[in-house]
Amino acid sequence: MFKKNNMVIIDAHSHLWLRQDTSWDGKPIRSLKNGRSIFLGEEVQMMPPFMIDSQNSAEVFLSNIDYAQVGAAVVVQEFIDGLQNDYLVTVQKQYPDRFLCCGMPDYRQPGFFAQAEELILQRGFRGIAIPGHRLLGKPLTDDEMMRMFRLMEQKDVVLSITLEDGDRQVGELAEVSSECPRLRIAID
């Protein structure tokens, strides 16, 4: 592990995937080659062109953070990358000292708590990611979210959340932290 002045530098927001194959708002997001992707229907350069297979794999990421003398990384998820739980659970097992990987249930579906419970209890994720800016108005304080936060607090699972613009979710997150005072929350 790299240390600088006896401190370990941690990348607190990173993404890994073997391929992007999803859609958002009815528009496709797909990996191509040479770091290019179809993103919301438009071909764009998503990654450096030397990443010819368009994978942002743990091994490629580790080579970059090793070069930058970064000791570890928190891996979050985003709907626009597609759910990466299957890949990230293997990364977490293979590199437990280098990555804290966050699982992500599909919050857009009713009954997502069962997915969250599986990610935490059976698959062993140490964090859960919420792309709050993509919840389409769903409150952080709804019953299912609060059940998930209570489970996370009980199992000492970190919440990594990106908040939407404005202050609505700030107040909601204050309610969450009041109800679950031992829940560890990382906001980006």
Give the residues covered by each predicted segment:
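Short, well-structured secondary-structure segments
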Residues: 61-64, 69-91, 96-106, 129
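Hydrophobic faces of well-ordered beta-strands that scaffold small-molecule active sites
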Residues: 10-14, 73-76, 100-103, 126-130, ...
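Conserved, mostly hydrophobic/aromatic
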Residues: 13, 65, 88, 119, ...
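Catalytic pocket-lining loop regions of alpha/beta-barrel enzymes
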Residues: 126-127, 139-188
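An N-terminally biased module of ancient metal coordination in phosphate/nucleic-acid-related enzymes
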Residues: 1-77
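Acidic-and-aromatic substrate-binding clefts and catalytic sites of carbohydrate-active enzymes
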Residues: 52-54, 77-84, 106-112, 135-141, ...
